[in-house]
Amino acid sequence: MNRLRNAKIYVERAVKQKKIFTIQGCYPVIRCLLRRRGWVEKKMVHRSGPTLLPPQKDLDSSAMGDSDTTEDEDEDEDEEFQPSQLFDFDDLLKFDDLDGTHALMVGLCLNLRNLPWFDEVDANSFFPRCYCLGAEDDKKAFIEDFWLTAARNVLKLVVKSEWKSYPIQAVEEEASGDKQPKKQEKNPVLVSPEFVDEALCACEEYLSNLAHMDIDKDLEAPLYLTPEGWSLFLQRYYQVVHEGAELRHLDTQVQRCEDILQQLQAVVPQIDMEGDRNIWIVKPGAKSRGRGIMCMDHLEEMLKLVNGNPVVMKDGKWVVQKYIERPLLIFGTKFDLRQWFLVTDWNPLTVWFYRDSYIRFSTQPFSLKNLDNSVHLCNNSIQKHLENSCHRHPLLPPDNMWSSQRFQAHLQEMGAPNAWSTIIVPGMKDAVIHALQTSQDTVQCRKASFELYGADFVFGEDFQPWLIEINASPTMAPSTAVTARLCAGVQADTLRVVIDRMLDRNCDTGAFELIYKQPAVEVPQYVGIRLLVEGFTIKKPMAMCHRRMGVRPAVPLLTQRGSGEARHHFPSLHTKAQLPSPHVLRHQGQVLRRQHSKLVGTKALSTTGKALRTLPTAKVFISLPPNLDFKVAPSILKPRKAPALLCLRGPQLEVPCCLCPLKSEQFLAPVGRSRPKANSRPDCDKPRAEACPMKRLSPLKPLPLVGTFQRRRGLGDMKLGKPLLRFPTALVLDPTPNKKKQVKYLGLDSIAVGGSRVDGARPCTPGSTARA
């Protein structure tokens, strides 16, 4: 009873501390380490019957990882369902499956194309060219790439036959481990020098296209030849590469080939590793452990996988990737490297890189003539079923695995002691970061979760790392002595990062190194994809009605000293407050000055297009006697290219200023009065309210408005006209007279009255005078 009571207390304490975990799969190291930290496991209930079905063999387990489980359990996956190698810390910490974003070759292929939006790096410098055969555009791009690669290979073969400057692994290719029987030699087929000329012209045209020399060209067939011409070109290429045909060339062609290859070296980052046999590796886009992978070197065979199969075309399952024909070999055997990294957060993106790794060897000597998977695939799930070739070097390990420390020692023996620290590790870190940057927006992440990934790299002869694929939930199986030690270490260090570091930011993180953490970005709340444009149509201006208007509040006056600081000099644009209304017993000119002084001081009024270009309309207001009636010409409100300046005057007119787009013969006149002649000079002494056209404005010499100032009397405000647009200039008159009967006026390069923009000419000088 005491034991049961203590167990109950222990569980209740773990529940309060949120230390409950569940494990799916075989993770004895994780279970042991969590129990040491006081966590309590919630056992999974395995129900019998049809409710729990094992996964189909054809379905992707790569979306859940390349889960090899244990080497002994790998063959018994049907009996023990392990769907996702996922362990759950009661919604606190989770291995997040992330929909297999990185495990899918399709996702990695497509995401890395967006790398230029994140960094100034070419994905082709660390990720072999990759295409989705199910997409029509990608299939066409792959066909053109295959053609161009064949043309480049012809140039390499010419140079190699002449100068032997492109060494290949002749010893490995002649190894007796090749499974393909040697064909009986016949009379060699001769290929004419015109074949080399076609390859040269295709490469030259490709270089000219990169230099944008094809902008004005209209060619139906891309890349120099027609599709039929390329088909014939490939047949002769196959004869040279695979059937031993003799490639004849002229001495002058050798130098051209060398020159063009040197130019291609600068624009094709993969020209060194791609070799000269045009081998591509075809992969199912959603499978792991090397299932369904094939190495092919004939275009027709690869296209047969998708041509005429609508299901494959729709699903886009097949991915074709350029095979690294010149990899770094260890004792004549191909190998790859498994590198772990940990993502603890996606916003901000936080990446931890594991310092230890291991390499996996193939069981067969390397050969480009033998395209069998046993030679070119280093997956342990494939190689464990094969026997080591008797032709392998005796220094290779029997279990086909090395630790990264043993690999570094081998590099020192090769005479490259700094290759690991200066080329390999920095290259792998950059490749991992770039792959995660491009996938960050497509991952359905959640807080308090993490994911451990396994990236596979192959190295070129120059030690350059090439990212092959990234697997979610990599295997933790202790298949060899190397993996037994390293896998236990990476699991223990993972818990140090995701659990211990939550309590102590300075705790030991083991072999994990923080290599990237971006600033946090606030994610806007998703409000749906509904787009809405609101507004109303612009109405056609109407003729001014004969009506009487009362005192109106003042229109917001937008002013600015020159240009800039629109928020400080345009309060009416950024706030709802209105400027004080001009009092009817005060001079309108004085009110304008006071409003102007409150905004920008006593300098010239001016506005800028930056603050006014969003304003909808312009309205000009004048003060007229309340009983005054107008007759309006029908075309008075139509914009004119050369507007005339209008002078309004009368016995009770306090602000004699306005600007209307009138012709020289158009004017306003009171009802019942005869219209004065267009060319007659207005008589300013007559106590009549009338409007007369003045001299046309010149953009270089703006003309002030001239009027008379009368005694103070009660006034009303009347609206003159509808929206007035496209004025070259506008002047505001200060009608306060001085002793010499002169008035001051303020010049504007543009004016906005009532909320709009009126483009203007040169501003007038403040303080200039004109006779009344």
Swiss-Prot record:
Pfam families linked to this entry: TTL
Record site: Essential for specifying initiation versus elongation step of the glycylase activity: 289
Amino-acid positions noted as binding ATP in the UniProt annotation, renumbered to this chain: 283, 289-290, 321-324, 334-336, 378-379, 469
Domain notes: Two conserved structural elements specific among monoglycylases, IS1 and IS2, are involved in glycyl chains initiation. Two conserved structural interfaces likely constitute the binding platforms for tubulin tail and microtubule.
Protein name per the record: Tubulin monoglycylase TTLL3
GO MF annotations, alphabetized: ATP binding; metal ion binding; protein-glycine ligase activity; protein-glycine ligase activity, initiating
SUPFAM superfamilies according to UniProt: Glutathione synthetase ATP-binding domain-like
Keywords, sorted A to Z: ATP-binding, Cell projection, Cilium, Cytoplasm, Cytoskeleton, Flagellum, Ligase, Magnesium, Metal-binding, Microtubule, Nucleotide-binding
Highest taxon listed in the record's lineage: Eukaryota
Keyword flag ATP-binding: yes
Binding residue positions for L-glutamate: 381
Binding site for a protein: 289
Named cofactor requirement(s): Mg(2+)
Region of interest: Disordered: 50-81
Role, per record: Monoglycylase which modifies alpha- and beta-tubulin, adding a single glycine on the gamma-carboxyl groups of specific glutamate residues to generate monoglycine side chains within the C-terminal tail of tubulin. Not involved in elongation step of the polyglycylation reaction. Preferentially glycylates a beta-tail peptide over the alpha-tail, although shifts its preference toward alpha-tail as beta-tail glutamylation increases. Competes with polyglutamylases for modification site on beta-tubulin substrate, thereby creating an anticorrelation between glycylation and glutamylation reactions.
Transmembrane segments: none
Catalytic activity: L-glutamyl-[protein] + glycine + ATP = glycyl-L-glutamyl-[protein] + ADP + phosphate + H(+)
Assigned EC number: 6.3.2.-
Binding sites annotated in the UniProt record for Mg(2+) 1: 456, 469
BP GO terms, sorted: axoneme assembly; cilium assembly; flagellated sperm motility; protein modification process; spermatogenesis
Annotated positions binding Mg(2+) 2: 469, 471
